[in-house]
Curated annotation (Swiss-Prot):
SUPFAM superfamilies: Ribokinase-like. This is ATP-dependent (S)-NAD(P)H-hydrate dehydratase. (6S)-NADPHX binds at residues 155, 208-214, 277. ATP binds at residues 248-252, 267-276. Residues 42-350 form the YjeF C-terminal domain. Catalyzes the dehydration of the S-form of NAD(P)HX at the expense of ATP, which is converted to ADP. Together with NAD(P)HX epimerase, which catalyzes the epimerization of the S- and R-forms, the enzyme allows the repair of both epimers of NAD(P)HX, a damaged form of NAD(P)H that is a result of enzymatic or heat-dependent hydration. It comes from Vitis vinifera. Belongs to the NnrD/CARKD family. Its EC number is 4.2.1.93. Pfam families: Carb_kinase. It is an enzyme of class 4 (lyase). One of its GO terms (biological process) is metabolite repair. Its cofactor is Mg(2+). The lineage of its organism: Eukaryota, Viridiplantae, Streptophyta, Embryophyta, Tracheophyta. One of its GO terms (molecular function) is ATP-dependent NAD(P)H-hydrate dehydratase activity.
Amino acid sequence: MLASSAVFRRQEFLIRCLGVGGQSQQFYRKSIPRTMALEADAENILRAITPTLDLARHKGQAGKIAVIGGCREYTGAPYFSAISALKIGADLSHVFCTKDAAPVIKSYSPELIVHPLLEESYSVREEDKKAISEKVLTEVVKWMERFDCLVVGPGLGRDPFLLGCVSEIMKHARQSNVPIVIDGDGLFLVTNSLDLVSGYPLAVLTPNVNEYKRLVQKVLNCEVGDQDAAEQLLSLAKGIGGVTILRKGKSDLISDGETVNSVGIYGSPRRCGGQGDILSGSVAVFLSWARQRIIAEGDLNISPKSPTVLGSIAGSALMRKAASLAFENKKRSTLTGDIIECLGRSLEDICPAK
């Protein structure tokens, strides 16, 4: 009995060594080097790309941002994005929205330049759609060369005619090398028309959990894996031709298909709607500033080098700082407007104006 027990134990040992039952397979998987997310030096990056306040500068040099979004149902999102850009330090902020949304958005703030140019299907006859689509594009293109960055998607909605018009606007922005930050329903549009951004290095996608899931399913044909989150994000960014993706989460993960950076600055446990809109405006401003600095000075002696990645890191960091500060004051009653009001102080704490 003892001998047979010893033999049995030895057989068990050999089975474990050979990997039956999956133990050696698990060891093998663990031994494979995985892509690791590098914690970004976010505050130093933010300082490096934020322009100084100089009396010699004129209106517009600190950034001109345009938000493409806003329809009958959704007027808050484009306002949050556009006003956040101004609160951070952009000089001018435009909103291109539908005619129904324009009076509402204008009433929120006189600081925004609101263009009631977009149309939805219900207000356009079938025989007029082509002519109106061309007219919308012509009117928006008149402004395009003035902008340092577009934000596409906040409050856009999913009306087919409206999305078709926005697709043409995005194509023209790409031809003009205007950076594009894509959020909200802009991500719905892009997920179904990847060619709009595929291979465009000045595009930034800012998906939340569900938007990211749809992108992964569409591009990688698999489910989201949290254990290999950095590796999967890297593959996704590569799969869309090197666009920059800011995956929102407990820590924001950012990749352009070359590296993966994380921003783990503590934000807020309060998940009120509209925070993604603040982030899109924030990323747009910092992307514009990073690009301006790189064009003017060349190597900024910071890493990473890509303006889209730098802008995403800085935008994420500031948004998180502001959310944390707002939560300290308002706790459970924290709203998006409270976070917006903390953007200026949060930036001042990191990068004091001189």
